[in-house]
Design a protein with these regions (language model features):
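Anaerobic metallocofactor- and corrinoid-dependent redox/one-carbon enzyme cores
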Residues: 1-58, 64-276
Length: 276
């Protein structure tokens, strides 16, 4: 039995499903998943609280949080330094910072396409937050990000199942730019793939728009206008992702990759064919 632990500090779009993607119909054998969440907060105090999760004895841990260089996630890495750990975050994007993670023994999947939300009280409420995350999830799922992460987590799970542990595990070190993500989506139609790639580029742009609204602007009109613009970009990206999938559906070429009971990744493209 492979024990996979997930620590969710704060929220990314990918946080909504990351603990579900290895066992999508709850029928996979040989894997057990547990989740420790700190809600919306992601500071050093929340990082310290994750210490109690060590009692479950995970074979490896996935920590997902915005901004892996922030104080909270930095503190969390100290807590989990001696456990095989993969950091999933929207940054850092600089190569030197990512290399430092690797030198410290951490795996990472950095997702610049997982967008920064317009987190200002003047603009964001629970409904706006939920709608934004729904749009983000549409892009992350259809355009290849979900499958990329699922495949990487499955690789580590397979290593544990084969008897490897601790420092023997080969952890991913991935900077998931749009071009890399879309290759995991399995598009057959080039126009569908182009729409998906456009959606990923738009999602990456959202952070550039929302960052000033969150951390720089002071005037309420500028804050609200800028954050609203960022969210409109995300909504348009979700529409492109939907269009891409509809093209594949119309051609009966939607690529599906369900898990067999033993964790093997099966494949199918025709709706009525059996996964092989």
């Amino acid at each position: 039995m492979v024990n996979v632990g997930f620590i969710k500090m704060g929220n990314l779009g990918m946080s909504q499903v990351i603990n579900l993607i290895q066992d999508e119909i709850a029928a996979r054998e040989g894997i057990t998943v547990r989740v420790f969440g700190t809600g919306a907060k992601m500071g050093p105090a929340e990082a310290a609280d994750t210490e109690s999760f060590k009692g479950w004895n995970a074979d490896f841990v996935v920590i997902i949080s915005p901004n892996a260089a922030a104080p909270g996630l930095t503190a969390a890495r100290e807590v989990w330094r001696n456990v095989p750990c993969i950091v999933v975050s929207d940054g850092p994007t600089k190569k030197e910072a990512r290399e430092a993670f690797e030198q410290d023994g951490f795996g990472y999947i950095i997702l610049p396409v997982d967008p920064l939300i317009g987190a200002k009280r003047e603009f964001l409420d629970s409904v706006e937050m939920s709608a934004f995350n729904s749009d983000a999830m549409k892009v992350l799922s259809v355009c290849g990000v979900v499958r990329l992460i699922q495949e990487e987590l499955d690789k580590v799970t397979e290593q544990v199942a084969s008897g490897r542990s601790g420092k023997e595990l080969e952890l991913p070190h991935i900077f998931a730019k749009p071009e890399k993500c879309v290759e995991h989506a399995g598009f057959a139609n080039p126009y569908a793939k182009a729409k998906a790639l456009a959606a990923l580029h738009m999602a990456e742009k959202v952070a550039q728009v929302n960052f000033p609204a969150c951390f720089m602007l002071k005037d309420i009109e500028q804050i609200c206008l800028t954050a609203a613009a960022g969210h409109e970009i995300m909504g348009a990206a979700a529409q492109l992702a939907t269009q891409a999938r509809e093209i594949e559906k119309s051609n009966d070429t939607v690529y599906r990759q369900p898990h067999a009971k033993n964790g093997t990744q099966l494949r199918k493209t025709k709706l009525y064919e059996k996964p092989q």
